Curated annotation (Swiss-Prot):
Top-level division of the source organism's lineage: Bacteria
Residue pairs linked by disulfide bridges in the UniProt entry: none
Protein's name in the database: Ribosomal RNA large subunit methyltransferase H
A Gene Ontology term for the protein's cellular component: cytoplasm
Gene responsible for this protein: rlmH
GO molecular-function term, one example from the UniProt record: rRNA (pseudouridine-N3-)-methyltransferase activity
Length: 153
């Protein structure tokens, strides 16, 4: 199978506590697409998070701006709820997908609105580290749906 699709995941995160699970799904996704995971965390974000939510969200946005390319999706609890089949349709036939996972304070409304789509994985507030792992599983599931693989039953 030819891997023409580029999938990018950008996350405000120091380290990956769910590394074993992330690696599992990253390997599975590689059968369908080239995957790039970038944990974005710098001194400005660390300082801003200690100031307030507004400054933190601004620092997240500044860190993410250079990566806005392809079909851009924000992970946001106020985003649209999709079934796995609907998500598979959403990402089907795209050349490049870029997913943005904010830090502890989420993302600014203006940033979310500047992207192509806002996706909610749950109405619950989830740890951003966990969101990334859950997103990887759903991306793999979507590829399986789109390729008639039995993983999704």
């Amino acid at each position: 199978m030819e891997n023409n699709l580029q999938v990018n995941i950008f996350c405000i995160q120091k380290s990956d506590e769910f590394k074993t699970w992330s690696e599992k799904y990253s390997k599975l996704i590689s059968k369908y697409a080239t995957l790039k995971e970038i944990n974005v965390f710098n001194k400005k974000i660390a300082l801003a998070q200690n100031l307030n939510a507004i400054e933190a969200k601004k620092s997240y946005e500044e860190a993410f701006m250079p990566y806005k390319k392809g079909y851009c999706i924000a992970l946001d609890e106020k985003g649209k709820d999709l079934t796995s089949i609907e998500f598979a349709k959403l990402i089907q036939d795209k050349n490049e997908l870029s997913f943005f996972i904010g830090g502890a304070y989420g993302l600014r409304e203006e940033f979310n609105q500047s992207l192509d789509f806002r996706l909610s994985l749950s109405k619950l507030t989830l740890a951003h580290q966990f969101v990334k792992t859950l997103l990887l599983e759903q991306i793999y599931r979507a590829f399986c749906i789109n390729n008639n693989h039995p993983y999704h039953k």
